[in-house]
């Protein structure tokens, strides 16, 4: 369906020159003098190439409808990441460039939302929080607990983050998948 360029948002899928693109960033620019434009940065779904386009805000762009479904993460192999539809038990292979940096937070049997166009995976949305174990961090030195500073820690998925001084090696913590920041100590 055709929409005006100024209505395109991050996460939308658009078709251009017969190819599908996921919008990475979309910004409407209104210069003091001249025509307002929409600056859109997008990633081609077929091969992951990023391009940047500039449209007049009134230009027509072909927006593609996508379907969002829950899938269960199974495993990773050299081809990509394998997910299963829990209702139909159909498996789908998601390329590594679609998952991107979120791959570090994928855990076996985790439920994620996959956005699909026909049968092609377009994007993935992980749960906001995951529970991970601290595998390496500095020991607490006496008198250091008075300040509210964070100390560096390495998690079981290899990601580095900052944790409060009372967190030790072996402690399970909850982190935000968006930026890897510490949220709280796990309650389990």
From Swiss-Prot:
Mention one GO biological process in which this protein takes part, according to its record: peptide biosynthetic process
Pathways per UniProt: Protein biosynthesis; polypeptide chain elongation
Keyword line: Cytoplasm, Elongation factor, Protein biosynthesis
Q: Which domain of life is it from?
A: Bacteria
Relate the protein's function as given in its record: Involved in peptide bond synthesis. Stimulates efficient translation and peptide-bond synthesis on native or reconstituted 70S ribosomes in vitro. Probably functions indirectly by altering the affinity of the ribosome for aminoacyl-tRNA, thus increasing their reactivity as acceptors for peptidyl transferase.
PANTHER family per the record? ELONGATION FACTOR P (PTHR30053), TRANSLATION ELONGATION FACTOR KOW-LIKE DOMAIN-CONTAINING PROTEIN (PTHR30053:SF14)
Q: What is this protein called?
A: Elongation factor P
Organism annotation: Bradyrhizobium sp. (strain BTAi1 / ATCC BAA-1182)
Organismal lineage: Bacteria, Pseudomonadati, Pseudomonadota, Alphaproteobacteria, Hyphomicrobiales
């Amino acid at each position: 369906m055709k929409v005006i360029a100024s209505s395109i948002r991050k996460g939308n899928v658009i078709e251009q020159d017969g190819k599908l693109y996921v919008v990475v960033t979309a910004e409407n620019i209104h210069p003091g003098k001249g025509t307002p434009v929409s600056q859109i940065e997008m990633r081609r779904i077929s091969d992951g190439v990023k391009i940047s386009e500039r449209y007049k805000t009134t230009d027509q762009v072909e927006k593609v409808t996508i379907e969002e479904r829950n899938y269960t993460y199974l495993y990773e192999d050299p081809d990509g990441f394998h997910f299963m539809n829990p209702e139909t038990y159909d498996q789908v292979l998601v390329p590594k460039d679609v998952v991107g940096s979120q791959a570090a937070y994928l855990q076996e049997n985790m439920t994620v939302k996959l956005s699909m166009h026909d049968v092609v995976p377009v994007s993935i949305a992980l749960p906001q929080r995951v529970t991970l174990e601290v595998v390496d961090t500095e020991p607490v030195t006496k008198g250091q607990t008075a300040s509210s500073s964070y100390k560096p820690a390495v998690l079981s998925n290899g990601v580095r983050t900052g944790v409060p001084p009372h967190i030790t090696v072996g402690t399970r913590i909850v982190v935000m998948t968006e930026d890897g920041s510490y949220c709280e100590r796990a309650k389990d």
